Amino acid sequence: MRFPVPLVPARLVRRYKRFLADAVLEDGTELTAHVANSGAMLGLMAPGARVWLAPKSGKTAKLPYGWELVEADLGAGPELVGVNTMHPNVLVAEAIAAGKVPELAGYARMRREVKYGVNSRIDILLEDDDRPPCFVEVKNVHLMRAPGHAEFPDCATARGAKHLAELAAEVKAGHRAVMVYLSQIASARDIRLARDLDPAYGRAFDLARTAGVEAIGLVCRIDAQGIEVTGTIPMLG
């Protein structure tokens, strides 16, 4: 995935009300950017941190910029971390189409945002003529508290637990269901559950895995030009 327009470097002032961040451009211009991330973003919000913003245009844009990347030292030295949680679905779909996810290869058709469960939409639905459909739910991973070990979630997520239960129901119905955890931290060697931050999600994950829901970890290469899935990493649960 390439960014459609060049990103603009800035310095973070603060993030507040979940979806807003104040920043200062290199020329001293102060602005407010949209934050497409409802999580706690632990370790990614230090005042003065270097950030990269995407200019927004069009009648629907309420703010002139959206926050895309932040430079953070998560134990392996400064690196770029993707904070926009709107991108993972696109990135995973691209990776599946490019054959970078062997576990999800070979399906004839791919659809996105298909209604299922209780007032939910599955991120990716893979279909074939000679095997059951595969329901794929994607989660963005941007938490790292120990070098190399990415974690999910970074705060309590009742919605995430609901998705796990709905995937388990699909397995019971004879379908295939897969949770994909996408690390937007390139130094991640594996992904683990942050059970201390959301014990309920950990329990829901265990129940889903016992029911037959699969779990896959992916990692990305990130720079100011774009983000690309580079391959799979262990999802340890």
Curated annotation (Swiss-Prot):
Pfam families, alphabetized: SfsA, SfsA_N
Alphabetized GO MF terms: DNA binding
Ranges annotated as spanning the membrane: none
CDD domains documented for this protein: SfsA-like_bacterial
Disulfide bonds: none
Family, similarity comment: Belongs to the SfsA family.
HAMAP family named among the record's database cross-references: SfsA (MF_00095)
Protein name: Sugar fermentation stimulation protein homolog
Source organism per UniProt: Azorhizobium caulinodans (strain ATCC 43989 / DSM 5975 / JCM 20966 / LMG 6465 / NBRC 14845 / NCIMB 13405 / ORS 571)
Gene: sfsA
